[in-house]
Amino acid sequence: MAWKVSVDQDTCIGDAICASLCPDVFEMNDEGKAQPKVEIIEDEELYNCAKEAMESCPVSAITIEEA
């Protein structure tokens, strides 16, 4: 199974918890906002990591959906 990860740049407040929890999937861009390092995740471990980051985002800026 594969999942698509995205971050709503208008919603993101740059808390960086996603990049801290899941650095293989998320990074901070030059504007101080989170962005996915990879658009599609196929590894279940990375999915679980990204899901934890999504659930920890204080403004719900992260979306994960089946690809």
From Swiss-Prot:
Pfam families: Fer4_13. It comes from the Archaea. Keywords: 3Fe-4S, 4Fe-4S, Disulfide bond, Electron transport, Iron, Iron-sulfur, Metal-binding, Repeat, Transport. One of its GO terms (molecular function) is electron transfer activity. Binds 1 [4Fe-4S] cluster which readily converts to a stable [3Fe-4S] form. [4Fe-4S] cluster binds at residues 12, 15, 18, 57. Residues 3-31, 36-67 form the 4Fe-4S ferredoxin-type domain. InterPro entries: 3Fe4S_ferredoxin, 4Fe4S_Fe-S-bd, Fe-S_cluster_ET. Its cofactor is [4Fe-4S] cluster; [3Fe-4S] cluster. Disulfide bonds join 22-49. Ferredoxins are iron-sulfur proteins that transfer electrons in a wide variety of metabolic reactions. This is Ferredoxin. It comes from Pyrococcus abyssi (strain GE5 / Orsay).
